[in-house]
Structure formats: structure tokens, C-alpha cells
Amino acid sequence: MKIISWNINGIRSNIVCDGKLAASGVSVLDECNMKILIEKHNPDIICIQETKCPISLGEKICPDCKMYPYKYWNESKGTGHRGTGYSGTSIWSKVKPMNVLYEYMNLCNTSGRFMYAEYKEFSLINMYVPNSGTNFEYRTTEWDKNINDIINGHMEKPLIVTGDFNVVSTELDIWNPKTLEKAKSPGVFKEERDMFKLFLENYTDLYRYKYSDEKKYTWWDMRSKGRERGNGWRIDYFLLQDKYLDMVKDCTIDNSIMGSDHCPIILEIL
């Protein structure tokens, strides 16, 4: 089975080439980035973050798509600039999950950042972690701690945790390691990295598990042309409990897919 995770930075511009999605929806994927991704990798499940798409419109995207008949959406419940066009997550699946949850335990999910899907052989969390630059206290004292409680309270079957974690793990995951030493910007604050280390007490970063010495990134600052210059960060991950690592076939990064400031990550499991 193949699972892809991608912070798409706005799904509308990545499913139709003219960047516009009418209120009536779209019946087929245009010759654009999402279609390129699907044709290249043929994933069984796609976890999408930062859809910036209300549920009402998401449900009109390829409603008769035979390849992914099961599509689930979560949206921001805010207003104004934090309304339904902000944040958001989605799961597209060839296989029908046994259960899909949009709220879990004590996690506040008003921005549509979290989805949980249970399948027969494993469970899956798709999440778009808040950037600490906008709400440091919430991120470090509430969100991360609640996620840690959720993932460590779920050990009876494999739990794949994926998405945009908005944190750098090690020096291999950032083009300029001095940024880690300074620890003065979102994504490299000590509190964020300490919580990520806590996640890894019972879970493994699957890309680093398969490629221990590779320097490959999943996010670039577009304003400074970071992608063209190779100045990136790896902040998108697949995590899995240590005791289930024998089910991992491969975990890779595809930085050839355009359309976002992030690129997709791919997990293959047995």
C-alpha cells in the first residue's frame, strides 16, 4: 500500500490549471499538479494539508472519481481571514475506512487541522500542525501535548501519523544548521523540537529510518526563492510506532511535484 502526504497550500489551484474552481465544483482533475502526482505514484491514500477549501466545495471536487471514491474533508470553523478558506485537511482513499473522526480527545480542532481514519490493518492521523509564529503558547502547551497523548494512547495497532509538523528535527533537516543553534524562529524553537523528540520516544521518523544520512527537504521559503537555491527544511513526516517498523517498505520525498511551498512525501507499507 502507498500513502502520500502533501501540504498543498491551496487545493483549488492544484486541481485546475487556471487556478479557479467554480462554486459548481469540478468533475475531473485538470492537467495540473494533483493529477501529475496521482499518475506518477498511484497512491492508495492521499493525506492533504492546508486545503484552504470549505467542505461544501470540497465535496464537489470529482464527486464521481472512480480512483478515489472515498474523500473526506475538514475545514476551519473560524470567521474572516480565518474562515473556511483557511487551513483545512482532507483524505482521499481507494479503500473505505472503518471510521473517520474530525475531533479526538481534548484536541481543539476549530481550524480543521486534524483527521483520524481507521482501517482494518492500521489507523492514520493526517494533521496540519499550527505554526508557532502565530500562537506559540497554544502550539507548545496545548496542541503538541494533546497530540502526544493521542499517539501514545494508541498502541494496540499500527498508527501512521503524517502531515506538516512545522518543526525541524535534526541538522540534516535544514539547509543552514546555524538556524537551529540560534533557535529564534518558528519551526526551530527549543520547545517545539523538545516535543517532537517526545513524539519519537515510541515512534520513528520513517524517512530518517530509511535514509539516515540524506539531506532532502520538503518545504522552501518562496519569497527568497529557497527552492531554486536548495535552501529548504524538512518539516513533513511519516511517524510509526517502533514495534511496527517491519511493515515499512520505503519512505521517500518527491521534490519534483510543484504547486506548493511543500512537496509530497510517500510511504510504502507491506
Over which residues does each language-model region extend?
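Active-site regions of metal-assisted phosphoester/phosphodiester hydrolases
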Residues: 1-5, 9-17, 23, 29-35, ...
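Structured beta-strand-rich core segments of catalytic domains in phosphoester-bond hydrolases
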Residues: 52-132
